[in-house]
Amino acid sequence: GSEMCIRDRLGLGDMLDEVVKHFGENALKEEEDERPRIAIIGKPNVGKSSIINKLLGEDRVIVSNIAGTTRDAIDTTIKRNGTEYVFIDTAGLRRKNKIKEEIERYSIIRTVSAVERCNVAVLVIDATEGITDQDTKIAGIAHERGKGMIIAVNKWDAIEKNDKTMKKFTEDVREKLSYMPYAELLFISAETGQRLPKLFETIDMVIENHSLRVATGVLNEIMAEAVALNQPPSDKGKRLRLYYITQVSVKPPTFVIFVNDKELMHFSYTRYIENKIREAFGFKGTPLKFIIRERKEK
């Protein structure tokens, strides 16, 4: 309830004061920046920079391009239809003499710092290589941090295709990234510009969904209907009861469900409720977070 919010807010205020003390004015300015931030992530040489360059080329507006002093990521501002987007590129500097493992480790560290600063991550995969273990590892970084997610299969123009290629590729990606079924999937080419306008549309949609709020009344209707359709599990004669659901925050949308017994609320039933909410609101491209709280029966 509200007391929880207030308590959390106080805690957060103190924490922010501490943080600001250490970082001075600049850190705060970055926090207040409301522009959508998109991290372009992926293993080396999949075409991350070419995508940004191509997007820049299409719009011909470079608002700013300031190389980060302390980090390798370079922020590029692109203006489109009156909205400014900040693209965070994790390509970084190539050091020729570094060993492969070291480059991989650095690229993971860079990915983490970029992902932490973004709302939406675009994972770029090389169509000519298919989805690899390193791709799934990088995707996990964004998933764990609750970011909006788009998978862009690049160099789509460079592979031999028949009528089944896209279907097969889609199945492969979905299977390897089965923990993020919410991710949007696009097949693009930075080289030819194929579907790059669609990438922007998808970014807009995912940003909107990532900060979408659903009214409590509506959520409880959806939950009541879900419970009526599919009886909650019981254990040793005790049945799970779901009392109430409410959305507590966004980026990603986060919900609290009050139940009689947390132990009875299995992962699979939470997933079922999530699917019902997604059926109603889509929430494409964004993870949803659920917190289960116990309320003793009166």
Give names to the regions the model predicted:
Residues 2-88, 96-109, 113, 117-124, ...:
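C-terminal-of-GTPase-core extension/linker across diverse P-loop GTPases
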